C-alpha cells in the first residue's frame, strides 16, 4: 500500500494549488472561492522515484452550517487515515483562530502523526519577512513555499519523501483495478451509493444539488478484484452552469467517463429518465465504455409485483438502440442490490475486454448465416467470406466481404444482436467493420 499524505488547513490557503503543483496537473478544482474543495480528493503521485497517495481535503472551518461541519469531519477523517500530514497556512492572511485550533488538535490528538508545518504564498521578499513570525507558533519548523510559483516545494517534498521507505511491491505494483465512473444528474444519490459501498462517510452527502464538486477516486476490493470508484459532480444542462466551478465539475464528469471501464449511470426513480440522462448514457457509448443503468431510491416508490417490469419497459422504450444496457433497481439507503451492481459491472468489464478466437467467430458466422440471407442491392448479393476480432479496448469485429456497400442496416443489426446473444456481450458497445476482400 502506498503511503498516504494528507493536505489539511482552513479554506483557501492553497491546498488544491499545492495538490496540483505536486501532481503536475490540474486535478482538484482551483478557485478563490473558499470551500471549493469539499471532499477528500485522492490521487497517485511520484517524487524522486518514490510513489505515494496525495489527499486534498475540504478546508478546516468551525462554522456551524451543514456543509462546513461535514468538511470538518472529512478533515479529521483524512488526518486519521494519513501517514503524513501537511498542515498548510497562508502568510498573507496570517495565523487565524482556525489555524491555531487545527494546530493544537494535530499536536494534542494526532501527536503520533508525522507533521509538516508549511507556510504558503511566500512570493515576495516582504512576505518572506512576514513568514518569520510563523516560527514562534510552537509548531514544527515551518517550510516557506509558494504553491503558485513552485518555490520551496521541491525541498519540502525531498524531506517528506526521505522518510518514506520504498518497497519492492510498490515498484512492481501494476494497475489491474476495474475503474467505475459513478455518473448522473445532481442529487440522484451517487455519493450515498459510494458511501454505502465503502462503509464510511467518504463523501459529503447532502440534499443540496452539486454538493460533490470534484471527481473523487475510492478504492475497494470485492471477491479479490480491486475496483476504483470515481464519484463525480452530477452532470447538469450546460444552460444551468452559470459559474466557472460548475463548468469545471461538469468537465470532470466527462473526463471521468473517458478514463473509466464501466459507467454506472444513476437515475432517480421518481422522475425517471430525462433528456440529460440519455446524454450521459450516450456519452459513455460514444467513448466505447461499458454501461450499467442504476435506478436509485427504489425504496421510495410505491410498487407491486409488476412495477419494476412496467418501469423497465417504459424506460427501454425511451432508450432507442441502447437495449443492451442492463438496468438494476437499487437503493443506496437500504443497500438493495448495491453489491449486485458491482458484480454486474465486473461482468460488463470482462465482456468489454473479451477476446474471441477467429475459428470460434467463423463457426458462429456460419451458424448465423444459415438462418438468414443477406439482402441484395441492385441485383448484387452480399457474400461474407470470414470474420475476425480486431485488437481494441472494446469488441471490434471485422467482416471481410465482396462489397461493403451491400451491407444494409437491418442486416448489420441482425449480426449485432446475434453476437450479443451468442457471446453474452451485455452492457458493452460493439463495433463492426465491413471490409472488401
Swiss-Prot record:
Domain of life: Bacteria
Record has Nucleotide-binding as a keyword: yes
GO biological process, alphabetically ordered: ribosome biogenesis
Keywords tagged on the record: GTP-binding, Nucleotide-binding, Repeat, Ribosome biogenesis
EngA-type G domain boundaries: 3-168, 178-353
Start and end residues of each KH-like domain: 354-437
Annotated residues for binding of GTP 2: 184-191, 231-235, 296-299
Keyword Nucleotide-binding: yes
GO molecular function: GTP binding; ribosome binding
InterPro entries: G_ENGA, GTP-bd, GTPase_Der, KH_dom-like, KH_dom-like_a/b, P-loop_NTPase, Small_GTP-bd
Gene3D superfamilies cross-referenced by the UniProt entry: 3.30.300.20, P-loop containing nucleotide triphosphate hydrolases
Residues that hold GTP 1 according to the record: 9-16, 56-60, 120-123
Subunit structure: Associates with the 50S ribosomal subunit.
The family this protein is said to belong to: Belongs to the TRAFAC class TrmE-Era-EngA-EngB-Septin-like GTPase superfamily. EngA (Der) GTPase family.
PANTHER family assigned: GTPASE DER (PTHR43834:SF6)
Function: GTPase that plays an essential role in the late steps of ribosome biogenesis.
Protein name in the entry: GTPase Der
Protein's organism: Pelodictyon phaeoclathratiforme (strain DSM 5477 / BU-1)
Encoding gene (name): der
Amino acid at each position: 500500500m502506498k503511503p498516504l499524505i494528507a493536505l489539511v488547513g482552513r479554506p483557501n490557503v492553497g491546498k488544491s494549488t499545492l495538490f496540483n503543483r505536486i501532481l503536475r496537473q490540474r486535478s482538484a478544482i482551483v478557485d478563490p472561492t473558499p470551500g471549493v474543495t469539499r471532499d477528500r480528493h485522492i490521487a497517485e503521485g511520484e517524487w524522486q522515484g518514490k510513489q505515494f497517495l496525495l489527499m486534498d481535503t475540504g478546508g478546516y472551518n468551525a462554522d456551524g452550517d451543514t456543509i462546513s461541519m461535514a468538511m470538518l469531519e472529512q478533515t479529521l477523517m483524512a488526518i486519521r487515515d494519513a501517514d503524513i500530514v501537511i498542515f498548510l497556512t497562508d502568510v498573507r492572511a496570517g495565523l487565524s483562530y482556525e489555524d491555531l485550533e487545527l494546530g493544537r488538535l494535530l499536536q494534542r490528538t494526532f501527536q503520533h502523526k508525522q507533521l509538516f508545518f508549511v507556510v504558503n504564498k511566500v512570493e515576495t521578499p516582504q512576505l518572506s519577512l512576514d513568514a518569520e513570525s510563523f516560527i514562534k507558533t510552537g509548531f514544527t519548523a515551518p517550510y516557506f513555499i509558494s504553491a503558485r510559483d513552485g518555490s520551496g516545494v521541491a525541498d519540502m517534498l525531498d524531506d517528506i519523501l526521505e522518510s518514506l521507505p520504498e518497497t519492492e511491491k510498490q515498484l512492481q505494483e501494476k494497475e489491474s483495478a476495474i475503474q467505475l465512473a459513478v455518473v448522473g444528474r445532481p442529487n440522484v444519490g451517487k455519493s450515498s451509493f459510494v458511501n454505502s459501498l465503502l462503509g464510511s462517510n467518504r463523501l459529503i452527502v447532502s440534499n443540496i444539488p452539486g454538493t460533490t464538486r470534484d471527481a473523487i477516486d475510492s478504492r475497494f476490493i470485492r471477491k479479490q478484484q480491486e475496483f476504483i470508484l470515481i464519484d463525480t459532480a452530477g452532470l447538469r444542462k450546460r444552460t444551468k452552469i452559470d459559474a466557472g466551478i460548475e463548468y469545471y465539475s461538469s468537465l470532470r464528469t466527462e473526463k471521468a467517463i473517458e478514463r473509466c471501464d464501466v459507467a454506472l449511470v444513476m437515475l432517480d426513480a421518481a422522475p425517471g429518465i430525462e433528456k440529460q440522462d440519455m446524454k450521459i448514457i450516450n456519452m459513455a457509448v460514444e467513448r466505447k465504455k461499458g454501461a450499467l443503468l442504476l435506478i436509485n431510491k427504489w425504496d421510495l416508490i410505491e410498487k407491486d409485483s409488476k412495477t419494476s417490469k412496467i418501469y423497465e419497459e417504459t424506460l427501454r422504450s425511451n432508450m432507442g438502440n441502447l437495449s443492451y444496457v442492463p438496468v438494476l433497481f437499487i437503493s443506496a439507503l437500504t443497500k438493495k442490490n448495491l453489491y449486485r451492481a458491482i458484480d454486474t459491472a465486473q461482468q460488463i468489464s470482462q465482456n468489454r475486454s473479451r477476446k474471441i478466437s477467429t475459428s470460434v467467430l467463423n463457426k458462429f458466422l456460419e451458424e448465423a448465416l444459415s438462418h438468414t440471407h443477406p439482402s441484395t442491392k441492385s441485383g448484387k448479393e452480399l457474400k461474407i467470406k470470414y470474420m475476425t476480432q480486431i485488437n481494441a479496448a472494446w469488441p471490434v469485429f471485422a467482416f471481410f466481404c465482396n462489397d461493403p456497400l451491400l451491407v444494409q442496416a437491418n442486416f448489420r443489426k441482425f449480426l449485432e444482436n446475434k453476437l450479443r446473444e451468442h457471446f453474452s456481450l451485455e452492457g458493452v458497445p460493439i463495433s463492426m467493420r465491413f471490409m472488401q476482400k
